[in-house]
A protein has these predicted regions:
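Cytosolic/matrix-facing juxtamembrane and C-terminal tails of multi-pass cellular membrane proteins
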Residues: 217-219, 229, 252, 256, ...
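Active-site cradle of extracellular carbohydrate-active enzymes
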Residues: 187-194, 198, 229, 233, ...
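Non-catalytic terminal regions of proteins
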Residues: 1-98, 181-200, 257-549
Length: 549
């Protein structure tokens, strides 16, 4: 079972295994999956929240079960923000679509040469055994593996580096990271900036990458030693979500709950605390006395900055030799922790009021020391593109109405949401960095009206309900038919991406397990739906495929 890209909220690490894509027996309290873009809650938590009449008092909860249920929803909503509101998460969200979009021409060539056969990985092995290599097929599979290596090294470097390093398709860390940035850039460019009039072009630093390979710079050539950070994106994302959740519960209790209370509830174990403990180690700090201690605020800010690499994607790549360290969230996190330590104890205690001013000041200082564009520079650049570039202006109008053009549909949806986060972050960065402190009145990090407006705007687009089916989130002022059409159109594309993945690398016939999406249609109806989407995308019906053994 592949759990890459599954992010869960659980008091039991074993329960997380039940929340993988396609498994309807959800035991964890909640989950968010990079492949299906759905925020899920356990049915009993849905019932608790639904009993509030759809209106959750985020600032004052009279009952612990309501506060706890909402905190789980907040935890999973933060995973949505991480994936559509940060550059690291956006790249992760774009990996599966990239296989279908960027390989389109070469997949057509493979179909023309070999006909409809699956999986292409098995076809490549047979051609290799017969010493009949196919250039287009090799490009498709090289692209697949490069992006897969990036995902593995970024999410779980410690657990997966050996598997990646020993894979026959693996060239180098730098190459995989370059391909991932290029794939995301290509999707964004094709959607809003096809001539790269605003965005930096990946080819601008192509020659530098070749020079690094030829000079055998570490990390950029075949056979190079691989240095990995002690943690990956998984630990950072779960740590950020869990400690924000804990701060919310702390504030909702009026500051009554202690660390021991959260430990007794199983909220400070395993993957959920790994990033925080790593931060304390590298920053040379002891465990803070209270949940709202400045050290906790600094940890969450470092998570935020670590998830915001921008060079090569939205801003020019200034030093290609630092590509790995400037892109990888795990390395960024470690370097930021070290820099915070070097700045001294006074700096580490800068977050006193959890204000926008503190966020900008501390994030700018750390970014300057990291020699990296700051979150403000990043957000300003994206906002500038969205305000001055005609195609991006059009996209933001689509995002406002939730009525999107057909081409690159999921890319338009995700990029529109990403841009909206960056715009709103310029006015209220503390909401996205310290949501737990903003969602209660305990520390009053942000006024109530602004908090409600921002939380309403940035909840996930797609949620499950107690029956486990997926529904569009109801948005005030938006027609329900428009929102349902958004969901329908979005998941037509998602099904095509999944079928393309199976075509490339999955043994056996096509699998039509879409029970994670809906239980309201028969297996035959679901198959027809997925088959039609795939045929529109590829020109070939799945039933025409021969399965290689």
């Amino acid at each position: 079972m592949n759990l890459d890209g599954v992010f869960v909220e659980s008091d039991d690490e074993k329960a997380a295994l039940a929340s993988a894509h396609g498994n309807r027996s959800l035991e964890a309290k909640g989950s968010y999956n990079t492949l299906d873009f759905v925020v899920r809650l356990r049915p009993d938590l849905h019932k608790v929240l639904e009993a509030q009449g759809g209106e959750i008092s985020m600032r004052e909860c009279d009952f612990w079960d309501v506060a706890q249920a909402f905190s789980t929803y907040l935890h999973e909503t933060i995973h949505w923000w991480q994936h559509v509101g940060t550059s690291a998460g956006l790249m992760l969200s774009f990996l599966q679509p990239a296989h279908a979009h960027m390989n389109r021409k070469w997949l057509d060539d493979v179909l023309a040469t070999h006909g409809p056969v699956k999986p292409l990985l098995r076809l490549s092995e047979k051609l290799s055994d017969a010493e009949q290599p196919d250039g287009a097929l090799n490009l498709v599979l090289n692209n697949w593996h490069d992006l897969d290596f990036f995902q593995k090294l970024v999410i779980n470097p410690v657990g997966l580096v050996k598997r990646v390093a020993e894979h026959p398709y693996f060239e180098s860390v730098g190459h995989s990271y370059r391909m991932a940035i290029g794939a995301a850039s290509w999707l964004i460019g094709a959607t809003v900036d096809p001539n790269y009039e605003a965005l930096p072009h990946p080819r601008d630093w192509e020659a530098d990458m070749e020079a690094l390979r030829e000079s055998k710079a570490e990390g950029f050539y075949f056979g190079s030693p691989i240095e990995i950070p002690p943690l990956g994106l998984l630990e950072i994302l779960e740590g950020q979500a869990r400690f924000s959740q804990i701060q919310y519960l702390y504030g909702a209790s009026g500051g009554y709950l202690s660390w021991d209370d959260f430990r007794k509830r199983g909220m400070l174990d395993g993957v959920y605390v790994c990033a925080f403990e790593t931060f304390l180690d590298f920053a040379e700090e002891g465990w803070p006395a209270t949940v709202d201690d400045p050290i906790v605020g600094l940890f969450l800010l470092i998570c935020d900055v670590a998830l915001s690499p921008s060079e090569g994607l939205f801003l020019p790549m200034t030093d290609p030799s630092s590509l790995i360290w400037s892109t990888d969230p795990g390395w960024r996190f470690i370097f930021l922790c070290r820099l915070a330590k070097e700045e001294g104890r006074g700096f580490k205690r800068s977050i006193q009021t959890y204000s926008a001013e503190e966020y900008w000041e501390v994030s700018q200082r750390l970014s300057d020391l990291l020699l990296s564009p700051s979150p403000r520079q990043f957000a300003e650049a994206v906002s500038r593109y969205a305000e001055t570039h005609p195609a991006w202006i059009q996209l933001m109008e689509e995002d406002r109405t939730f009525e999107y053009r057909e081409g690159n549909f999921p890319i338009r949806v995700l990029l529109g949401r990403f841009t909206r986060v960056q715009r709103d972050k310029l006015t209220a960065p503390q909401f996205f960095c310290w949501p737990g402190m903003c969602l209660t009145s305990y520390r009053q990090a942000l006024d109530s009206e602004t908090v409600r407006s921002l939380f309403s705007e940035h909840q996930a687009l797609f949620l499950d309900r107690a029956d486990r089916d997926v529904y569009p989130r109801l948005v005030p002022g938006k027609d329900e038919k428009t929102l349902q059409r958004l969901l329908d159109d979005f998941y037509i594309w998602v099904s095509m991406y999944e079928m393309t993945r199976q075509w490339l690398v999955e043994d056996g016939p096509f699998d039509y397990d879409y029970g994670w999406l809906t239980s309201k249609f028969s297996g035959a109806e679901i198959k027809d739906w997925a088959d039609n989407a795939f045929k529109v995308g590829t020109g070939v019906h799945p039933d025409a495929f021969s399965v290689l053994r």
